[in-house]
Regions:
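Non-catalytic cap/lid and distal C-terminal segments of serine-dependent acyl enzymes
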Residues: 1-265
Length: 265
């Protein structure tokens, strides 16, 4: 049983309100956490961060095979109080038993669900969140985040849906995934023109694919992204592929995506 934040700012959207109409996706609830400023000024609107594996991003010390959650709600609140980032709305979209099929954006085998999942996020979840909560709806204020396969699909959606998203954080991206032609995500990046997209990448150095992550970062630089202006890469020496390490690094992603230029530098 997942332990969710005990706060009046935490909301659960019942799956019946956001029923997926695409590609036989499994229904699921969605979790929304408002910033403290939303209680102080009811007219104010806020940027939104859509997080994959959204059941794992909260302050549950026991979930995720004992590693604990990301504590993203507490981290965002603290960074906002310190003036290191603007207040944002967090949206957690849980994974399902079809996680691999929903989060794999390349056709590595039949019946992939990443395209229906992207449509579901934009046309169902985002539309409902924008109607119900005080969001800034435009692409400038809409971002994605995820880790492992969740980071991979977040990065892919940011590229494929530039009219909706302008920022993305990919922690420990599962860049080892290849399509049927053995094409990697590194090659996907090398084939792209530079976009108006701010990208945060990171990885650990212990069984976390750091060599491939370096190649992805270098590919972005080769295509015109500017270091620390458009793209940031952090390598966590001794970091592993788990929620504890993602929790420890999450603040870097939040500051890069939602902090001022001084904070990013």
């Amino acid at each position: 049983m997942i332990q969710f934040p005990e706060s009046s700012r935490f909301h659960v959207i019942d799956e019946s309100k956001i029923y997926p109409r695409f590609g036989h996706l499994t229904p699921r609830p969605v979790y929304v956490y408002l910033p403290e400023a939303a209680e102080e000024d009811h007219r104010r609107r806020f940027p939104v961060l859509y997080c994959q594996d959204g059941q794992n991003i909260w302050d549950d010390p026991h979930c995720c095979y004992g590693h604990g959650g990301w504590f993203l709600n507490q981290i965002a609140d603290q960074l906002t109080r310190e003036g290191k980032m603007e207040p944002i709305i967090l949206v957690g979209i849980p994974n399902t038993h079809a996680r691999y099929r929903e989060y794999t954006p390349v056709k590595s085998y039949d019946d992939i669900l990443s395209h229906p999942y992207a449509n579901y996020l934009v046309d169902v979840v985002k539309r409902h969140v924008d109607r119900r909560f005080p969001t800034k709806k435009d692409r400038k204020h809409t971002a994605l985040m995820g880790s492992s396969l969740g980071g991979l699909v977040a990065l892919w959606m940011a590229h494929k849906l530039p009219e909706t998203f302008s920022k993305v954080a990919c922690l420990s991206g599962a860049f080892q995934v290849r399509d049927r032609q053995k094409k990697s995500f590194v090659e996907f990046v090398r084939e792209r023109q530079q976009q108006d997209l701010r990208i945060y990448l990171d990885c650990g150095t212990i069984r976390d694919g750091h060599r491939t992550s370096r190649q992805v970062h270098e590919a972005y630089l080769s295509r015109g992204w500017c270091e620390r202006g458009d793209v940031m890469y952090f390598e966590d020496k001794g970091g592993e592929h788990n929620e504890r390490c993602w929790r420890e690094r999450a603040w870097r992603a939040l500051v890069f995506l939602f902090g001022g230029r001084e904070a990013r530098e």
